[in-house]
Amino acid sequence: MYYVIASLLGYIFGCIHGSQIVGKLKGINIKDGGVKNAGASNTTILLGWKYGIVVALIDIFKATAAIFLLLILLQGNAIPTQEQHIYIYLTALFVIIGHNYPITMQFSGGKGTASLVGALIAIDWRIALIGIGVLILFTIATDYLAVGVLSMYISFLITTYYIFGLAPFFIVVGLSVLSIYKHIENYKRIIGKEETKLSSMFGKKAS
């Protein structure tokens, strides 16, 4: 029963899209321009960093809120701690599936980076601190967000295994494969020196 609740809860929250909300307010479809992706980075490319931050905050908050709501639902049900961890990670997985493949956007969404950050915050402060730190470090060092995201997933795999064990680790493996698949075009553009750099994104003024 709780597997279904965690999955549905995650997917429903995942379908709340920051880029869709901002896009409607600005009268544009974020997926129609830039790198054709419904996420914070493409919003930054099209509308400037202020709108990109708004989208990122919405997508971060929805993941954190979904996991916190799950924890409230689990309270008082005498569920073993290890089992709770699986439900938490399952919720995180489906938030990102909902973000990447939202029914509200004909199953064509973003890449789940901001939502993963929100999930890390809700899962464990140590995992969040290391993961976000790695994301920032490698993104700034390479000037490519996609490299920072890949590094964050690697850190998430390692910290999950050491803190929560094998079952949640396998869920993160699934998340990592999904992220790599969603970022394949970014990696191709990086190799071809065609990827938009982080520094150029934040050089764009909000419109």
Swiss-Prot record:
UniProt subcellular location: Cell membrane
BP terms from Gene Ontology: phospholipid biosynthetic process
Membrane topology according to the record: Multi-pass membrane protein
Disulfide linkage: none
Membrane spanning stretches: 3-23, 53-73, 85-105, 127-147, 154-174
Keywords associated with the record: Cell membrane, Lipid biosynthesis, Lipid metabolism, Membrane, Phospholipid biosynthesis, Phospholipid metabolism, Transferase, Transmembrane, Transmembrane helix
GO CC list: plasma membrane
Predominant localisation class: membrane
Catalyzed reactions: an acyl phosphate + sn-glycerol 3-phosphate = a 1-acyl-sn-glycero-3-phosphate + phosphate
Keyword Cytoplasm among UniProt keywords: no
Pathway: Lipid metabolism; phospholipid metabolism
Functional description taken from the UniProt entry: Catalyzes the transfer of an acyl group from acyl-phosphate (acyl-PO(4)) to glycerol-3-phosphate (G3P) to form lysophosphatidic acid (LPA). This enzyme utilizes acyl-phosphate as fatty acyl donor, but not acyl-CoA or acyl-ACP.
Similarity annotation: Belongs to the PlsY family.
UniProt subunit comment: Probably interacts with PlsX.
Name of the featured protein: Glycerol-3-phosphate acyltransferase 1
Species this chain originates from: Oceanobacillus iheyensis (strain DSM 14371 / CIP 107618 / JCM 11309 / KCTC 3954 / HTE831)
Phylogenetic classification of the source organism: Bacteria, Bacillati, Bacillota, Bacilli, Bacillales
